[in-house]
Every structure is written in structure tokens, then in C-alpha cells.
Amino acid sequence: MMSRFLIPVAIAGLLTACASTTPTYYTLQASTSTAVAAPVAQAWKGFQLRRMDVPAQLDRRSFVLTQSTGGQVNLLNDSQWASPLPDEMSLALVSGLQDRLGVPQLAGAAAKTPYWQIDVLVQRFESVYGERATLELSWALSPVGFEAKTRQCRWLDSEPAASVPELVQAHRQLQQRWADALAAQMQGKPVPVNLSKAMLCAS
């Protein structure tokens, strides 16, 4: 972990570099080398991500850094997401679920096609320079066209990280762990213990 006395100096250096460097672009999507799961027999044929709501201050492409002391927030224009954060999170979740489930997202589901509908509300997508990345969100998983219980859950997970590239990688890992838990939930499988610790669902 970076010394708290050095963090403001390091951030100042990053902000100074912003004015003179070409932006570096990052994505939340995992490597395409992940093997796609074979679809299994099930009552539903796909899923639809209906909503991905992100706090207004994060609805941007610039990387948002939070200082560990004082709560100061800095925008890094030289470190940007490849698309606005809500789109990055949506693309990462959709591709992650497709890889794990072997079924497509149904953007315009045909009549009588059974699918899972997903609504996500992001409370926190935090990058604390020199310390950690944190993801906090809630979601509703609703069956459409088939019989199943609607799930309403909350997720809070963190991953240690220091530099901007490390924070990006940490956010990718958090996104992948959440996709693992959500995919297990959709398949009616037990969520692994290491993931269930970050998860709280309404009974």
C-alpha cells in the first residue's frame, strides 16, 4: 500500500501529466480468451439487461480518483474509459454472462420467449488511489415468461490496488466476481462461499 503522505504528491503528478499526454483508454471487459460455456437445458432462453443506473458524477469517460483522506475527487483526463462508465459496466456484464451461460442477451425479446430481466443500480464505483477499488450495487433479477422467484440482492466488494492500471485491473476482477455470482444465481446454483460473502439478498 502506498504511504498516505506520498499519495497527494503522486496524484498531483498525474494531474500535471493530464495537460500534456495523449489519453490512455481502458475497458472493463475481460480478455476474449475466456471459453464460452455450452448452453444447458433450462426454462429460459436468454437474458436482458434493462437498466444500468450509475451515479451522475461517474457517468463519464474520465477516470475518477478518490483520495483516501478528505474525500477529494480528481478527474484524470489522460486516463479514460473506452466508453462512458455505464456502457463499460453494461458491456462487461453482458459479455461476462454470455461467456458463463452460453446464451445471448435478448435486446428485443420475441413474444413468449422466456428470459431473465436484470435491473442494476450502482451505488459506488470507487477508485481510491494507492489503496483499493470498491464496487457497491444492487440488482433485481426477474423472470419473464417463466416461473421463478424474483431476486433482489446487494453487492459490496473491494480489491487492493495502487496505481491507475492496477485500479483498472481490480475493477475488472470485481466485475468478473459479480458476474460469477449473478450467473450462478440465474442457473439456480449455490453462489460460491468466497462470493456470497459480498452478497446480501432479500428473503
Regions found by a protein language model. Give the residues of each.
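Mid-chain, structured segments of secreted extracytoplasmic proteins
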Residues: 71-102
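Structured segments of extracytoplasmic/periplasmic soluble domains
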Residues: 55, 92-103, 177, 181-189
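A structural "domain/chain start" motif
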Residues: 18-82, 190-203
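Surface-exposed short loop/turn segments
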Residues: 19-38, 43, 99-146
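Short secondary-structure boundary motifs at beta->alpha junctions and helix caps
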Residues: 72-80, 146-184
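Sec-dependent bacterial lipoprotein signal peptides
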Residues: 1-18
